[in-house]
């Protein structure tokens, strides 16, 4: 999870590719409509924006819930502050060939920072 938090703070795209599986899908509700982004679209959006680090934001994050279902499946609920908001995610993780990957991300802005 440290790498996940670092990716979102620094937007290190090499690290991004080591955290998010290439088949990962991102889900969120924007203006009342479901927003679905496959890996490539999410990667492009992250690469194009200014990072919280470059904006002088400090890292503020915590893991609210971790539930490992099996040797190959887990769910994590992190909360972090970035871009003036408090974000919560549900991350679906799968262990593939001994490495944990984020394979699904459901996100929501739950407040202001």
Positions of the model-derived regions?
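Short beta-strand segments enriched in hydrophobic/aromatic residues
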Residues: 20, 80-82, 106-107
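Hydrophobic pocket/interface hotspot
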Residues: 4, 16, 24, 76, ...
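Short, well-ordered alpha-helical segments enriched in acidic and aromatic residues
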Residues: 11-27
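Short beta-strand edge/turn micro-motifs at domain boundaries
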Residues: 86-113
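Surface-exposed, charged secondary-structure patches
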Residues: 25-31, 35-86
């Amino acid at each position: 999870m440290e790498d996940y938090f670092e990716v979102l703070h620094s937007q290190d795209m090499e690290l991004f590719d080591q955290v998010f599986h290439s088949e990962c899908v991102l889900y969120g509700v924007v203006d009342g409509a479901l927003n679905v982004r496959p890996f490539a679209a999410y990667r492009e959006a992250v690469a194009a924006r200014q990072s919280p680090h470059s904006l002088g934001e400090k890292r503020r994050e915590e893991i609210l819930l971790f539930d490992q279902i099996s040797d190959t499946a887990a769910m994590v609920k992190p909360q972090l502050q970035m871009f003036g908001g408090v974000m919560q995610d549900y991350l679906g993780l799968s262990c593939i060939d001994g490495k944990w990957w984020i394979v699904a991300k459901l996100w929501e802005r739950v407040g202001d920072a």
